[in-house]
Amino acid sequence: MAKRGKKYVEAAKLVDRAAAYSATEAVELVKKTNTAKFDATVEAAFRLGVDPKKADQQIRGAVVLPHGTGKVQRVLVFAKGEKAKEAEAAGADFVGDADYIGKIQQGWFDFDVVVATPDMMGEVGKLGRVLGPKGLMPNPKTGTVTFDVTKAVNEIKAGKVEYRVDKAGNIHVPIGKVSFEDAKLVENFRTIADTLQKVKPAAAKGTYMKNVTVASTMGPGVRVDVSTLA
């Protein structure tokens, strides 16, 4: 395990590891314990009582955070004809078809989110091995395979984030930047928590939200009292 820096160690002393803080207190602590010299991302981590190995307990989707993430997302849209024009009008950063497939195969990744119209998926599917491991493959569950490219681009630009449970039952989601007002971070935090409650698999048994923490990019994790996220 990497040795922690002096600033991190000092910051960690401010956090009572045995305590579960309210969402508001946790956000305040995350700001106090942020050691980065840049506008660090604030990330929430949810440990869920699900078995991701079972198909009926997979959790994946997307939600628009009311105050965005503070990051400007570069959107690539695979579309043709009128749909390509719609994507450009909506503010997509890159719009095209086969030409971008070739660029990506050659190692171009100057984008953060990929959207594709359903008729393009036969071609985009060729990029599965490249985009899949990076979490960039378009998917109907996250609204990134759609003919409504205007809505897709608008939502992404407005602060839509994707969530997906990993093999250990965890979900990590950015909820903003340390420069955000506390109230905005808390509202974003509650929005994602509420969304995860709504998509709880019927097959999930026992406690669903087992543990929730929040932290800045280079700061210590702060445990959150789940009841304060309701």
From Swiss-Prot:
PROSITE patterns: RIBOSOMAL_L1 (PS01199). It comes from the Bacteria. The keyword RNA-binding applies. One of its GO terms (biological process) is regulation of translation. GO terms for cellular component: large ribosomal subunit. CDD domains: Ribosomal_L1. GO terms for molecular function: rRNA binding; structural constituent of ribosome; tRNA binding. InterPro entries: Ribosom_uL1_bac-type (IPR005878), Ribosomal_uL1 (IPR002143), Ribosomal_uL1-like (IPR023674), Ribosomal_uL1/biogenesis (IPR028364), Ribosomal_uL1_3-a/b-sand (IPR016095), Ribosomal_uL1_CS (IPR023673). Gene3D superfamilies: 3.30.190.20, 3.40.50.790. Keywords: Repressor, Ribonucleoprotein, Ribosomal protein, RNA-binding, rRNA-binding, Translation regulation, tRNA-binding. NCBIfam families: rplA_bact. Belongs to the universal ribosomal protein uL1 family. Binds directly to 23S rRNA. The L1 stalk is quite mobile in the ribosome, and is involved in E site tRNA release. Protein L1 is also a translational repressor protein, it controls the translation of the L11 operon by binding to its mRNA. PANTHER family: 54S RIBOSOMAL PROTEIN L1, MITOCHONDRIAL, LARGE RIBOSOMAL SUBUNIT PROTEIN UL1M. Part of the 50S ribosomal subunit. This is Large ribosomal subunit protein uL1.
